Amino acid sequence: MLSQASSISLGEDNSTDALNAPFETLLDANPISNQFEIAAMNIEYDFNLPAEDVVSYKGVKSNDNGDAGMVLVVEAADGKAEEVANQLTAYQQDQVAFYGNYAEFAQAQENVENAVIAFKDNTVVMVIASNECTADLDSAVDSALGE
């Protein structure tokens, strides 16, 4: 488990039991094809989340070309949930711009535009529908956050 570390340790399972239930709820609603696990390096460099803001996380993305599907659950440090959510929104905007460069990725771009980012207490979630997803992700997020 991470705690105010200067850098997230690579190669560790950075999830905690508290993240498993919301993660599984979201993954059930939004099955991700050809999954790859989001690594500590991605948390810091792709999402630009400072290590001191992240206690733990669990996430997967689709490794399929043109499928932006993703489920990410972050346990933010005390008082950092809103900052983490804001940084995930910045990531979302970057991804919208990226997919906008490719006409063949119109579905992925739309899915990123409609991503759901929410937080409750120190738990922050970001869900991008996979191309195959038909579930209502808003209600899945509410359920995952115990709303």
PLM features: residue spans?
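N-terminal "mature-domain start" segment
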Residues: 1-55, 145
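Soluble non-cytosolic domains of exported or imported proteins
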Residues: 13, 17, 37, 78-82, ...
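Extracytoplasmic/secreted envelope proteins and their assembly/folding machinery
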Residues: 20-23, 71, 81, 85-92, ...
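Short, compositionally biased low-complexity segments enriched in polar/charged residues
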Residues: 33-68, 83-84, 109-113
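A short acidic-to-branched-hydrophobic micro-motif
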Residues: 67-78
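Short Gly/Thr-rich strand-loop-strand
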Residues: 81, 85-120
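A short, solvent-exposed beta-edge/loop patch
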Residues: 107-147
